[in-house]
Amino acid sequence: MKAVLIPGDGIGKEISQSVVDITKAMNLDIEWVEYQAGAEYAAKTKEVFEPGLVDAIKEYKWALKGPTATPIGTGFRSVNVALRQKFATYANVRPIRSFKGIDSKYENISHDSWKYRRSL
């Protein structure tokens, strides 16, 4: 299986490589196809992300994106916003679960609970 890997900026490169190493250690059949995006890439090219990235995500159906920086006050809109607009994905969906031994306002929340937030 092929999947797009977008390492991103700063620590993104490090943690993305860790994910690649983990998938290899687990003998998962993933061929990572790397594309660049983020502030570091934009500083070199004046583009938010590498040409072909959107087409690769459409083709492979899977992508892992590391953290990306966004210049404040100047430059481009965030990589997250650009990708959300390209793919019309505006929902931020998060699973919610309670853990035994951890006090919280709500107890016994199963993994079947979800938080939905609109992302623009």
Question: What role is predicted for each listed range?
Answer:
Residues M1-Q36:
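N-terminal phosphate-binding or glycine-rich loops at protein starts, especially the Walker A/P-loop
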